[in-house]
Every structure is written in structure tokens, then in C-alpha cells.
């Protein structure tokens, strides 16, 4: 597996990740992917697969770089915080490695969203 640095974080992630959009396979195929080196797992609030990902990474969390996303309809400050808390509950974890905006929402100032994202980092709920 080839790795690349995630921006200027010093963190190296696999070039190939396991995407979970429309994923229906349960934890075992994801676990096999992790065994084979595909340790970047991408999920999202919208995919409704965070619980399956959580089951797959249980006991393997130290091997996985976990990325998930917040819906564009949840970009107000309080909604971002609630969405991240829900994702963590579904993932059965205490930190998201990379929390991303799934798509923008022109009705919400980006400064409001980014302030909430920074708060998640400050609280230790999100790394990047």
C-alpha cells in the first residue's frame, strides 16, 4: 500500500481508502480490507453506515484512519456539534480523525461552520 501525507499534518494515510457509500456488507469485508492495508475508512452521516464501520473497527481502532462527513443541512454551529456527537455514538468511538463538510450550504456562513469544526477539535472529538 502506498501512503501520502495528509496536508501538512505529518500523518500518513493510505492512497486507497475504503468508501462506505451504499455499503451493505457488515463488518467482515471492512475488517478484511483493514488487514490488507486499506486502513483509511470513509463514511458519512448521509451514508447511514457509521454503525457498520464502528463494528468493523472495534478492536482495530489504532490501525484505522477514520473519516466521516457532516451533511450540508447540518452546518449551523449547534447542528455540526450534534451531528459529530451522533457520528461518534454510531461509530462507538471517542474521536473522528478527519471530519469533513459533505457539501456546502450557501445559507450558512462558512465562518459559523468552521468555528464549530474548530470547537470539535478543541474538545478532542475531532483530530482534523
Regions flagged by a language model, labelled:
Residues 35, 75-128:
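Glycine/proline-rich, positively charged
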Residues 21-23, 44-46, 69-73, 101-104:
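Active-site beta-loop-alpha junctions enriched in small/polar residues
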Residues 24, 28, 48, 65, ...:
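Residues at secondary-structure transition points
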Residues 1-64, 122:
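N-terminal binding-site loop/beta-alpha segment at the start of enzyme catalytic domains
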Residues 61, 70, 125:
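P-loop/Walker A phosphate-binding loop and immediately adjacent motor/lid segment at beta-alpha junctions
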Residues 63-65, 127-128:
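Proline-centered loop/turn at the N-terminus of a beta-strand
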Residues 65-67, 97:
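A structural signal for isolated positions on well-ordered beta-strands in alpha/beta enzyme cores
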Residues 57, 70, 117-120:
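Hydrophobic positions in alpha-helices of CheY-like receiver
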Amino acid at each position: 500500500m502506498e501512503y501520502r501525507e495528509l496536508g501538512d499534518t505529518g500523518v500518513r494515510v493510505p492512497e486507497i481508502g475504503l468508501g462506505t457509500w451504499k455499503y451493505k456488507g457488515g463488518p467482515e469485508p471492512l475488517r478484511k480490507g483493514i488487514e490488507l492495508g486499506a486502513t483509511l475508512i470513509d463514511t458519512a452521516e448521509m451514508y447511514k453506515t457509521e454503525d457498520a464501520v464502528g463494528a468493523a473497527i472495534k478492536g482495530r481502532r489504532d490501525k484505522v484512519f477514520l473519516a466521516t462527513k457532516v451533511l450540508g443541512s447540518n452546518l449551523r454551529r449547534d447542528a455540526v456539534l450534534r451531528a459529530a456527537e451522533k457520528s461518534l455514538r454510531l461509530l462507538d468511538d471517542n474521536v473522528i480523525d478527519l471530519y469533513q463538510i459533505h457539501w456546502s450550504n450557501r445559507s450558512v456562513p462558512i465562518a459559523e461552520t468552521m468555528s464549530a469544526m474548530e470547537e470539535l477539535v478543541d474538545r478532542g472529538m475531532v483530530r482534523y
